[in-house]
Swiss-Prot record:
Function, as annotated: Catalyzes the conversion of glucosamine-6-phosphate to glucosamine-1-phosphate.
InterPro entries reported for this sequence: A-D-PHexomutase_a/b/a-I (IPR005844), A-D-PHexomutase_a/b/a-I/II/III (IPR016055), A-D-PHexomutase_a/b/a-II (IPR005845), A-D-PHexomutase_a/b/a-III (IPR005846), A-D-PHexomutase_C (IPR005843), A-D-PHexomutase_C_sf (IPR036900), A-D-PHexomutase_CS (IPR016066), Alpha-D-phosphohexomutase_SF (IPR005841)
Active site residues per record: 112
Source organism: Bordetella parapertussis (strain 12822 / ATCC BAA-587 / NCTC 13253)
Protein name as annotated: Phosphoglucosamine mutase
Length: 452
């Protein structure tokens, strides 16, 4: 595929008012996407159903969402596309609505876990998955063409969805077994002042839990600020203070999950993924799990011990999903809390992932600590080394020798990961080992080989 000009691995993202996150670009993007979707609709229309394609737009709670939503709506309408405005809903809700309403595409306005100063726009296909590469490429090409407008009789209509949140709440609940409930469970749910603020608490409450909700007072500027999956320590304090059984933390667009138990212990994506997979194994065989380059070595070892395959993808839920689809596997995720259960949904969903963890705990009548007790997480040490101009670390003899020595010493008791930073001229040296001292010494040995 040719180099992308506008789209990154997760749509278009940047600072509000910058080159791509502004009203003018969003208008052009809406028109370009509309033209491509209209063409696809004409080429694949069966002669039945809607005369023109429909698209749903959902957003998180950033103040800039109003501006971008209006601009996208105008561009899509100018291209002859009908628009459904879902308002503030989680990213995975847009994927669900697109699929269940048989729409041409879904559009999400969100910068996920970033602060309010940033925003982004990404698309879902009619199947609730990422757009095919050829469609993204066609939209990029159309972006460089002049802005136009269809005839007045062909303009798209727009209407607000009154039931978007309610539909999604029911979908989430449908992924929790009908023979179970959450009666007697005391939860703290942190929605990060984000897209799930009026959704997630209802899901758990309607299943029977006693819910105390935090991070549910968005003002356009406080999304992810000191709350949510990026700051689970806030949730841990609230769980302890209220004597709750568990805490559930989502990020700004609710596709990421962290959990906390009654003692205040924080559980990351690797531990929660294991909790889900262990329960699924009691229903039948699990062929394999996809993690990333950053997935803890302890999860890899534990999965191997219980007979589950494990593969690493590049960092990013897009790459995890691609590898899951290529292998036909159902489960995958990232340490950050992006968890994919393709037997429940087509994309990562923090609320649904939490329900799958709760399913495991209710079935086993166990605490979270008890359920993942056999998963031993390996201590991790990372050292960032500045890269001298012109230095090719991949062919550096000293680093190669040090890496060989470290890997020989670890010999199945840990792993080494060396990768260049994508944002600054630094080399990231990461070692995971059975004990912290060994991880520290091994990482330092790698750094010393570069004169750091």
């Amino acid at each position: 595929m040719s180099q992308r000009k506008y789209f990154g691995t997760d749509g278009v993202r940047g600072e509000v008012g910058g080159p791509v996150i502004n009203a003018a670009f969003a208008l052009r993007l809406g028109y370009a996407a509309g033209r491509v979707l209209a063409r696809e609709h004409r080429e694949h229309a069966s002669g039945r159903g809607r005369n023109r394609p429909q698209v749903v737009i959902g957003k998180d709670t950033r103040i800039s969402g109003y501006m971008l939503e209006s601009a996208l709506e105008a561009g899509l309408s100018a291209a002859g596309i009908d628009v459904l405005l879902a308002g503030p809903v989680p990213t995975p809700a847009v994927a669900y609505l697109t699929r269940t309403l048989r729409l041409a595409a879904g559009i999400v306005i969100s910068a996920s876990h970033n602060p309010y100063q940033d925003n982004g726009i990404k698309f879902f296909s009619a199947h609730g998955m990422k757009l095919p590469d050829d469609i993204e490429a066609a939209i990029e090409q159309a972006l460089d063409e002049p802005l136009g407008c269809v005839g007045s009789e062909e303009l798209g209509r727009a209407r607000r969805m009154a039931d978007a949140q309610g539909r999604y709440i029911e979908f989430c609940k449908s992924t929790f077994p009908h023979d179970l409930d959450l009666n007697g469970l005391k939860l703290v749910v942190d929605a990060a002042h984000g897209a799930a603020y009026n959704v997630a608490p209802h899901v758990f409450r309607e299943l029977g839990a006693e819910v105390h909700a935090i991070g549910v007072s968005p003002d356009g500027f406080n999304i992810n600020k000191g709350v949510g999956a990026l700051h689970p320590e806030s949730l841990a304090e609230e769980v302890r203070a209220r004597g709750a059984d568990l805490g559930i933390a989502l990020d700004g667009d609710a596709d990421r999950l962290q959990m906390v138990d009654g003692t205040g212990r924080i559980y990351n994506g690797d531990e929660l993924l294991y909790a889900i997979v262990r329960e699924r194994m009691q229903r039948g065989p699990v062929a394999g799990v996809v993690g990333t380059l950053m997935t803890n070595y302890g999860l890899e070892r534990q999965l191997q011990q219980i007979g589950v395959g494990f593969e690493r993808a590049n960092v990013g839920d897009r790459y995890v999903l691609e590898q899951m689809q290529a292998r036909g596997w159902l489960y995958g995720g990232e340490s950050s809390g992006h968890l994919l259960c393709l037997d429940c949904h087509t994309t990562g969903d923090g609320t649904i992932a939490a329900l799958q963890v709760l399913t495991a705990l209710r079935r086993a009548d166990a605490t979270l600590a008890e359920w993942v007790a056999d998963l031993r997480m390996y201590p991790q040490k990372m050292i960032n080394v500045p890269l001298a101009p012109g230095l090719d670390w991949k062919t550096h003899d000293g680093l190669a020798r040090a890496r060989g020595a470290v890997e020989a010493e670890l010999a199945g008791r840990g792993r080494v990961l060396i990768r260049a930073s994508g944002t600054e001229p630094k080399l990231r040296l990461m070692v995971e080992a059975e004990d912290e001292a060994l991880a520290q010494a091994s990482a330092q040995k790698l750094a010393d080989s570069l004169g750091a």
